[in-house]
Amino acid sequence: TFCLCLFTACDGDDNLLCYGTHTEIEGDVTTFGAIGDGKTDCSKAINSAIASLPSEGGVVVIPEGDFVLDAPIVINKHNVTIKGLNPGMRSNIDVNGINDLLGPGGGSKLVARNAEAAIKVETGMKGVKIMNLMVSGGTEAKNIGIHFTGTSDNGILSNIIGINLHTGIKIEQAK
């Protein structure tokens, strides 16, 4: 089992998305048919949201919910930001013991059910940002969370939590 926690503070540059607000003109994946119910494959809908971005890139918002992926989210444009509202960790108070005091709950979550990677950044992409998400391998723990496939430049990962993954982040030939 793999757990990766990268934390950053929220500030005006992120439009306070980790607190649940966004005011930029952004593409919300639910407008493309993604359903965060933990059952429905959302791969095509999220990839359609990315495809709809202009050639210079843009922001794709993953709202709260469990968005299942049977194929990877493929980033094949420069300056694409995948932005969740928050990574969804909560504390659990167990009056009978101190086990499991922190666990997943709520937030923006990608579940790589049958995808080899939840997010795949294609070779040569520049300015990719992925933030405020939980990435899960589902029940199998055989997946990669975020895969930079080759010479990518200026990629930023911020406020990402990975759970139940074989490999959290795989970076190949980065500059």
Where are the model-predicted features located?
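Right-handed parallel beta-helix
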Residues: 79-85, 126-137, 153-166, 175
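Glycine-rich beta-solenoid repeat tracts in large extracellular/virion proteins
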Residues: 72-76, 89-102, 117-124, 142-151, ...
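N-terminal extracellular ligand-recognition/capping segment immediately after the signal peptide
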Residues: 47-50, 54-100, 107-115, 134-135
